[in-house]
Amino acid sequence: MVTSNPTKIGHTHVAEALKIPIHIFFTMPWTPTTEFPHPLSRVKQQAGYRLSYQIVDSLIWLGIRDMINDLRKKKLKLRPVTYLSGSQGSETDIPHAYIWSPHLVPKPKDWGPKIDVVGFCFLDLASNYEPPESLVKWLEDGDKPIYIGFGSLPVQDPKKMTQIIVEALETTGQRGIINKGWGGLGNLTEPKDSIYLLDNIPHDWLFLHCKAVVHHGGAGTTAAGLKAACPTTIVPFFGDQPFWGERVHDRGVGPPPIPVDEFSLPKLIDAINFMLDPKVKDHAIELAKAMENEDGVTGAVKAFFKQLPQKKPESDTEPSSSKFFSLSKCFGCS
């Protein structure tokens, strides 16, 4: 069995050469659906949602097909894949397990039995974490703060962003924790009692002590905030982050996402006020309770064994080139 994610170049081709099944595991959707667009697309109209998956898949294929065919011919001893066919992992006959909470993003109705949504997977980092005394004392000295941080992502103007963050917290009367990260946030002209600056820290420990969170919208950070029942504002930079921002807003646990190039004082103030609404907190608590009984690791293992094919004659197990996505079929040319 080959286990992989859709972005790993060559996974289906290696499985074909070895004549063994493949199972895809991933943290964002790669299977076509009419319920939401491909996370790497920016399609806004529902009529284009399903097509967006095929287009993204095809664009990836067009960029790597020469390299893949070189691998197939020289290393895997397989015939090359034709110019307009090929796929990076969205074939409906390949089992997929998606690692997110079905209470946040339910399994789409047009996904078949080979697709599973298993729940988030978490590392327990909090149990072995010893917070600095200064942080513990600061947390004890006032109301729960709002966490703001963007991890390792670069910030174009960290001084300006820090100023916006501080002014938004002061305007809304909130204490704040700023994660300096790799973006250089938190260079204050003078220390402020209402602001605590820190470097990387286990989210599963910190978020339990926070009133709300503002972050970039990575799948792991999003999951940690929701598990801690924190209303969430997502400031997406790229990739699947806009997707998670939309899902958080759709679920009622945060405001509409603020793209990083639209980050401004009025928008951050509005986002903080949105998160302070008691109804939003109630929704966050409701979602966190629903997630309590999820075990993504166990769900992933169960999905793996459920989808493990029964042993068949060798002639039946060899992947067929006809199973690969065809761009010509997508546009009705066949």
Where are these regions (language model features)?
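A donor-sugar binding/catalytic signature common to diverse glycosyltransferases
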Residues: 3, 198-246
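Short beta->alpha connector loops at strand-helix junctions that form conserved
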Residues: 25-27, 217, 234-238, 256-260
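Nucleotide-activated donor-binding/catalytic signature segment of Leloir-type glycosyltransferases, i.e.
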Residues: 173, 183-201
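Two-component system phosphotransfer/interaction surface
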Residues: 262-277, 297-309
